[in-house]
């Protein structure tokens, strides 16, 4: 089995924040693939289902972003799974809006949710990095990620969540590069990317 973690903050106040795009994608996976109803456990909410023959548990930590690792550690301990069976979907300010990159391990780029997870379980889990853009100055980052997506951004946000959810089975199968490529091509076909920009994915897909 695999654990898919979406990062965000709980509550209506944060629901539309850029920081919550991980929650949004995980919610869409549950909706589009007929997962079980959400229930409270592991200091979060979970839903269970199957993607491309792989058993998946979705987890949305309710600890607030900075303590996400506590929920991930609880779930990983319960299921007795290692870092290689965990995928974390999170907002990424170092990527342009709507861009997606997939990688195993690496730095945390100042992301407090990733910092907490790495502190609790180690650093070698899969990250599905969902671009939300950079506001241009370090002092603006806090308000940027805790701000809601603008009305003009909603079309690509909705499209990205749907396309990522439709192709999530590739992540379940360990085909990270194929996932990134499929998302890129589908978003490009909808007109959200420039044609001259190439998507780059993970390295595990052979």
Curated annotation (Swiss-Prot):
Q: Which reaction does it catalyse?
A: an N-acyl-L-alpha-aminoacyl-tRNA + H2O = an N-acyl-L-amino acid + a tRNA + H(+)
Quaternary state and partners of this protein?
Monomer.
Q: Where in the cell is it found?
A: Cytoplasm
Q: Name one GO molecular function term.
A: tRNA binding
In this UniProt entry, which residues are annotated as the site Stabilizes the basic form of H active site to accept a proton? 91
* GO annotation (BP), single: protein quality control for misfolded or incompletely synthesized proteins
Site entry (Discriminates between blocked and unblocked aminoacyl-tRNA), positions: 9
User: Which purpose does this protein serve, as stated in its record?
Assistant: Hydrolyzes ribosome-free peptidyl-tRNAs (with 1 or more amino acids incorporated), which drop off the ribosome during protein synthesis, or as a result of ribosome stalling. Catalyzes the release of premature peptidyl moieties from peptidyl-tRNA molecules trapped in stalled 50S ribosomal subunits, and thus maintains levels of free tRNAs and 50S ribosomes.
Q: What is this protein called?
A: Peptidyl-tRNA hydrolase
* Catalytic residues as annotated in Swiss-Prot or TrEMBL: 19
> Which InterPro entries does UniProt cross-reference here?
Pept_tRNA_hydro, Pept_tRNA_hydro_CS, Pept_tRNA_hydro_sf
Q: What is its EC number?
A: 3.1.1.29
**What family is reported?**
Belongs to the PTH family.
Q: Which UniProt keywords apply?
A: Cytoplasm, Hydrolase, RNA-binding, tRNA-binding
Q: Which GO terms describe its cellular component?
A: cytoplasm
Principal place of residence? cytoplasm
Q: Which residues bind tRNA?
A: 14, 64, 66, 112
Provide the top EC class: hydrolase
């Amino acid at each position: 089995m695999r654990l898919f973690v979406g990062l965000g903050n709980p509550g209506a106040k944060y629901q539309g924040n850029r920081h919550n795009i991980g929650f949004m994608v995980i919610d869409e996976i549950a909706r589009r693939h007929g997962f079980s109803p959400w229930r409270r456990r592991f200091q979060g909410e979970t839903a269970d289902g199957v993607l491309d023959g792989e058993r998946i548990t979705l987890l949305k930590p309710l600890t607030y972003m900075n303590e996400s690792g506590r929920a991930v550690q609880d779930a990983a301990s319960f299921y007795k799974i290692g870092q290689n069976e965990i995928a974390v979907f999170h907002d990424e300010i170092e990527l342009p809006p709507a861009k997606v990159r997939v990688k195993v391990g690496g730095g945390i780029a100042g992301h407090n949710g990733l910092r907490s997870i790495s502190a609790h379980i180690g650093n070698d889990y899969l990250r599905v990095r969902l671009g939300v853009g950079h506001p241009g100055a370090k002092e603006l980052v806090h308000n940027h990620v805790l701000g809601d997506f603008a009305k003009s951004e909603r079309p690509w946000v909705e499209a990205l969540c749907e396309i990522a959810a439709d192709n999530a089975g590739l992540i379940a199968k360990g085909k990270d590069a194929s996932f990134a490529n499929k998302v890129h091509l589908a978003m490009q076909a909808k007109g959200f990317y420039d044609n001259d920009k190439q998507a780059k994915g993970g390295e595990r897909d052979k």
